[in-house]
Amino acid sequence: MKIALGIEYNGQNYYGWQRQEKVRSVQEELEKALSHIANEKIEIFCAGRTDSGVSGTGQVVHFETNAVRPEKAWAFGTNAHLPDDIAVSWAKQVDDEFHARFSATARRYRYILYCNKLRSAILAGGITHCHLDLDAEKMHQAGQCLLGEQDFSSFRAAQCQSHTPWRNVHHLNVSRIGKYIIVDIQANAFVHHMVRNIVGSLIEVGTGNQPIEWMQWLLEQKNRQLAAPTAKPDGLYLVDVIYPQKFDIPKRPIGPLFLEDGLLNRPLK
């Protein structure tokens, strides 16, 4: 049978999602826990492989197994064997045609900035600290030129292995809650470091170092060296993966934590 799981994880203590030799990964920890519950070796496939330090509240994985367990056993049982910074949020038996990566039609990320002169110890690792205040409205306006299907070479990491820089951005919204700036972006897929590179350049607009029109210019240049430095991984979260309705994949409130849609100044699409 094929099982899908919703996964939440704090990426601070991991070298990314993907299993690697001699370093901790989210995939390895999850496969070990699932293999214990299934009494057989389990290999998982995820919707999106996040980088070192990046967290997830809406990751989706699937695996195949000969073991027959109630759905709640896959959730509660697996959680009992996971470290505290990884958790299963739901479990569901799915059709054989479902694939966590290839069945997905879109991925959604949120990047959290904390604008304050002094950094926070409690929030360390979960947000990116910015000692300057940012103009969220200008950042939002600047980001609208990125909507639609376009060449994102200017926001693509040099080591990106994708065959094409073209991606289709469905929405990009920038909102503020007090001292927090939230960049919310959804696309069919993302090139390597795309969200963090976009955020790094939006910060330049938010501080007033660059005009709103600069983002359009960057996009047209198709040159990564002209854009701003990559934003830190600390504030980035994979918050949702979108699938066709026929798979009936469970939905959870978009987070992380207190950052639900209804609390943001700008309604999210």
Curated annotation (Swiss-Prot):
Its EC number is 5.4.99.12. Keywords: Isomerase, tRNA processing. One of its GO terms (biological process) is tRNA pseudouridine synthesis. It holds the Pfam family PseudoU_synth_1. The keyword Isomerase applies. Gene3D superfamilies: Pseudouridine synthase I, catalytic domain, C-terminal subdomain, Pseudouridine synthase I, catalytic domain, N-terminal subdomain. Substrate binds at residue 109. InterPro entries: PsdUridine_synth_cat_dom_sf, PsdUridine_synth_TruA, PsdUridine_synth_TruA_a/b_dom, PsdUridine_synth_TruA_C, TruA/RsuA/RluB/E/F_N. It catalyses: uridine(38/39/40) in tRNA = pseudouridine(38/39/40) in tRNA. Coiled coil: none annotated. GO terms for molecular function: pseudouridine synthase activity; RNA binding; tRNA pseudouridine(38-40) synthase activity. It is an enzyme of class 5 (isomerase). The active site is at residue 51. The keyword tRNA processing applies. Formation of pseudouridine at positions 38, 39 and 40 in the anticodon stem and loop of transfer RNAs. Homodimer. Belongs to the tRNA pseudouridine synthase TruA family. HAMAP family: TruA (MF_00171). This is tRNA pseudouridine synthase A. It comes from Haemophilus influenzae (strain ATCC 51907 / DSM 11121 / KW20 / Rd).
